UniProtKB/Swiss-Prot annotation:
Protein name: UDP-N-acetylglucosamine--N-acetylmuramyl-(pentapeptide) pyrophosphoryl-undecaprenol N-acetylglucosamine transferase
GO cellular component entries: plasma membrane
Keyword list, A-Z: Cell cycle, Cell division, Cell inner membrane, Cell membrane, Cell shape, Cell wall biogenesis/degradation, Glycosyltransferase, Membrane, Peptidoglycan synthesis, Transferase
MF (Gene Ontology): UDP-N-acetyl-D-glucosamine:N-acetylmuramoyl-L-alanyl-D-glutamyl-meso-2,6-diaminopimelyl-D-alanyl-D-alanine-diphosphoundecaprenol 4-beta-N-acetylglucosaminlytransferase activity; undecaprenyldiphospho-muramoylpentapeptide beta-N-acetylglucosaminyltransferase activity
Organism of this sequence: Salinibacter ruber (strain DSM 13855 / M31)
Keyword Cell division among record annotations: yes
Length: 370
């Protein structure tokens, strides 16, 4: 067996749901094998262009475009960009000679993993959602190993190569101290905290629904609302909202470990990483799936956690009719919240990143190029 350091090619892009799991896996690989040579492939105009270099890894640009379901005219250039991306990926794989290629989804993963497979490199895929995305569903047929976050995803990939290992999450989420977290949000020991968030950009539906029921929530004398509005909605909401000693409105929460540690209950979207963060932190939640995602995968995520007893699922269309009642009932029922928290932790896979990293290194050792 060769003694040279393993060479690993990572690819996953477009959104945080694809980018951050790739970074977490790379970090875990580096923790296990500090000598590992890890490089990323991705686009130059999406999240990975900023997040990957900030995490300390080199990013090799690949031209890529997904199928546009709304802006149909832009699909005219799709064949040319796919071909360009394949040529770039072929050259990249030839230059770095990876022992294994790891994909976490997003359309940029398609040309890179296809080029790696055509050059005889083993593929490992990580799927974050209960319903596997298009790129991963196609490439899973070529992969030697498929790591899943939800057991339901086994229905969409070759079962003989699949293992349920969870989504990689940040260690800082699990290290946060609840007392320090509550102090950071000025919440007393006996306060009940509702955490509201709709992603980094925000959710118009969740923000609007919370704004309409804010008065009855704060009428509960010990309820504190920590509200991440998202960048799109912060200015307008803060202009409309009156100040209140138990209301904390922020554009974005950098220390999410503190937010989860302080929360008694969350209301949020049902993206894959959010669901995984809820489970590893044991945070009961009301999940409001976004209707604007491919294959309605957030609803499938929400259903999975609701079936496990870890969350309550509400459609966007039902927020005005039911959100106030659901939130007040849960905030008033500590026993049910405790059961939901326990069910969430039962679904958690806190060692997901390390589990996947060990598999990456095992494949690299088995298929070392020289």
């Amino acid at each position: 067996m060769s003694t040279r350091a393993p060479h690993i090619l990572m690819v996953g892009g477009g959104t945080g749901g694809h980018v951050y799991p790739a970074i977490a896996i790379a970090d875990a690989v580096r923790a296990l094998r500090p000598d590992a040579q890890i490089v990323f492939a991705g686009t130059q105009d999406r999240l990975e262009a900023r997040a990957v270099p900030e995490a300390g890894y080199a990013l090799h640009p690949i031209t890529a475009q997904g199928l546009q379901r709304r802006a149909v005219a832009s699909n005219l250039l799709l064949p040319f960009r796919v071909a360009q991306g394949l040529v770039q990926s072929w050259r990249l794989v030839g230059a770095i000679e990876p022992d294994v290629a790891v994909g976490t989804g997003g359309y940029v993963a398609a040309p890179v993993l296809m080029a790696a497979w055509l050059r005889g490199r083993p593929l490992l895929i990580q799927e974050q959602n209960a319903y596997a995305g298009l790129t991963n569903r196609v490439l899973a047929r070529l992969a030697l190993r498929i790591h899943l976050a939800f057991p339901e995803a086994k229905d969409w990939v070759p079962a003989e190569h699949a293992v349920v290992s969870g989504n990689p999450t940040r260690q800082s989420l699990r290290d946060a101290d609840p007392d320090a977290a509550r102090a950071a949000f000025n919440v007393p020991e006996d306060g009940r905290v509702l955490l509201v968030m709709g992603g980094s950009l925000g959710s118009a539906a969740i923000n609007g629904a919370i704004q309409r029921i804010l008065d009855p929530l704060l009428a509960e004398g010990d309820v504190h609302v920590v509200w991440q509005t998202g960048t799109r909605y912060y200015d307008d909401l803060t202009e409309d909202l009156d100040e209140h000693p138990r209301l904390r409105v922020v554009e974005y929460i950098d220390q999410m470990g503190h937010a989860y540690a302080a929360a008694d209950l969350a209301v949020c979207r049902a993206g894959a990483l959010t669901c995984s963060e809820l489970t590893v932190t044991g945070t009961p939640a009301v999940l409001v799936p976004s209707p604007n995602v491919t294959a309605d995968h957030q609803t499938k995520n929400a259903r999975s956690l609701e079936r496990a007893g870890a969350a309550v699922w509400l459609d966007e269309a039902d927020l005005d009719a039911h959100l106030e009642t659901v939130l007040l009932d849960l905030l008033g029922n500590s026993d049910r919240r405790a059961r939901m928290a326990e069910a969430a932790r039962d679904r958690a896979r806190p060692d997901a990143a390390e589990t996947i990293a060990r598999d990456v290194l095992a494949l690299a050792d088995r298929y070392r190029t020289n």
